[in-house]
């Protein structure tokens, strides 16, 4: 369950928004500060239309989405909590050219205004910023939603995207295995 994974990873904190003030004491209109509740760290300055999606909310919808047999593998934060992510291992394996490919689902949420909530299927096991970038860049399908008014209502789209990614991986495996089974002669290659 995602809640337990968040607790074990130390990501079970909340984000609060506060007004932003200039050194003169004047409120700066149009901006808010995203603050981590446990230590009052500023995670980012965002526009006033930015809607917070708590870590628990961002990852809770995945519990039902993932279903039986899915295991949360790892979770972490980058840049002092500005970006949080969670990785789940899917029990299904794809055999491609005789190699077992184990797919993962990576979930990413930012609190600094730098990015949307993203969900992607990937064969890359995320452990740091570089592998997170690789996983999201190399994914065949990525669902994302900006931190705006309707972000939570768009979660059904994530389910659809992941179903398409699953279908893509299955089809890719079949196509590669079919190509591998075809015999080519030198004559056919040179033609």
Question: What residue spans do the PLM features occupy?
Answer:
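Intrinsic disorder/low-complexity polar-acidic segments
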Residues: 60, 66-191
């Amino acid at each position: 369950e995602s809640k337990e994974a968040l607790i074990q990873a130390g990501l079970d904190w909340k984000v609060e928004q506060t007004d932003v003030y200039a050194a003169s004491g004047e409120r700066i209109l149009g901006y808010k500060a995203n603050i981590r509740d446990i230590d009052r760290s500023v995670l980012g300055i965002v526009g006033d239309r930015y809607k917070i999606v708590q870590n628990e909310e961002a990852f809770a919808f995945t519990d039902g989405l993932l279903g039986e047999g899915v295991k949360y593998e790892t979770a972490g934060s980058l840049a002092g909590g500005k970006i949080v992510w969670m990785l789940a291992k899917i029990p299904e394996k794809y055999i491609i050219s005789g190699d077992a490919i184990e797919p993962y689902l990576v979930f990413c949420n930012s609190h600094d205004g730098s990015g949307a909530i993203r969900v992607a299927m990937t064969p890359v096991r995320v452990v740091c910023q570089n592998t997170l970038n690789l996983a999201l860049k190399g994914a065949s399908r990525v669902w994302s939603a900006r931190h705006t008014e309707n972000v939570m209502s768009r979660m059904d789209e994530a389910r659809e995207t992941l179903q398409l990614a699953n279908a893509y991986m299955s089809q890719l495996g079949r196509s590669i295995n079919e190509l591998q089974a075809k015999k080519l002669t030198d004559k056919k290659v040179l033609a």
